[in-house]
Amino acid sequence: MGACLGACSLLSCASCLCGSAPCILCGCCPSTRNSTVSRLLFTSFLFLGVLVSIIMLSPGVESQLYKLPWVCEDRTQQPLVLQGPLDCGSLLGFRAVYRMCFATAAFFFFFMLLMICVRSSRDPRAAIQNGFWFFKFLILVGITVGAFYIPDGSFPKIWFYFGVVGSFLFILIQLILFVDFAHSWNQRWLCKAEECDSPAWYAGLFFFTFLFYLLSIAAVALMFVYYTESGACHEGKVFISLNLTFCVCVSIIAVLPKVQDAQPNSGLLQASVITLYTMFVTWSALSNVPDQKCNPHLPTKNGTGQVDLEDYSTVWWDAPSIVGLVIFILCTFFISLRSSDHRQVNSLMQTEECPAEMVQQQQVAVSDGRAYDNEQDGVTYSYSFFHFCLVLASLHVMMTLTNWYSPGETRKMISTWTSVWVKICASWAGLFLYLWTLVAPLLLPNRDFS
């Protein structure tokens, strides 16, 4: 009897994995929308790739792999071949990260193309989006195995520039998400203050606004101390000063009376969040400056105080990379878990709130202990755009894990000004986007920006 019950349980799990219903996760989250479950599972595939990349970057894994005589010879010699033209060096360091992230990006790019113009769950392709997870996992594994057989050649350099462009775009998406988060936060606390008639909510908004600006000022001071030097590091001084000036300007514009009249929910909380994020991007950019005098993250390799960049054989993680990875994880979850209550953000991110008619269906789903399909009359998010965001996320995490270092001609990682300029330009573009959200209702009064 026990064997029969076990077999039935296995068959049930198999039907969940191979069918069109996300049963396993729904069992853990019985009142979850079908669309949310699917996004979480796709995001888990991305995080699985990130975990594999982190493991392959670990120095301990590298040293243990080279100790196996049937895998690799001594690192000073030519590596052995594993069952075909696979260089075992591709299993290590930044080369493994490039290939793993190439696989995840290709996986999501395939689904981005496949899901173009899906309008509702009645489309047959919606069943593929929301189910068949076992086969999706097999596809991802197959692409990953194939990626590790890609010969080095010019692949790392070409893929580096793909990563630069994708990461630039994902930085802008992160800023949009921060704007939306701060907007929702500000709006809800103001509503609480009006409902409860309590000044504590206003005090909370003031405290966090003050805290974010205080952290931003501290970041500016620390960047001037550690990333600039008297008579040198002119680029760093200009970048810090310009971004500080731009942040002050957008903060002032956010509280102008005309802007407040057009957008009553705009305020210093959103501006403080954008200021703090801009300072982080600036810090991250300065950590890639290829000059040891202006970048304390670069170790000195010789007695002259100069850094021999070609001596870099491994990639280390600095503080900006760790913070960037945490922000990446939070923003990716943010994309997966919710739709915005801000119409402009919904339009830009191709999402929408759950329709009112879904409330009754949700209540029935909770009582029945199951997930419910909230996309019969129309999808709540663009499938293609969601996968496009995950493609950009794959490229961004690739650059984050490799510290934005460019692969050199001798299979080393080198720091370049390209990474610095891309991040600085991304910070400027992000500030411009935020500024546009403030002044657009004034410049285009005939359009609805509510």
Curated annotation (Swiss-Prot):
Entry annotated with the keyword Membrane: yes
Q: Which InterPro entries match?
A: TDE1/TMS
Does the keyword section mention Membrane?
yes
Instruction: Give the bilayer topology.
Output: Multi-pass membrane protein
According to its UniProt entry, what is the function of this protein? Non-ATP-dependent, non-specific lipid transporter for phosphatidylserine, phosphatidylcholine, and phosphatidylethanolamine. Functions as a scramblase that flips lipids in both directions across the membrane. In contrast to SERINC3 and SERINC5, has no effect on gammaretrovirus particles infectivity.
Q: Its family?
A: Belongs to the TDE1 family.
What is the protein's given name? Serine incorporator 2
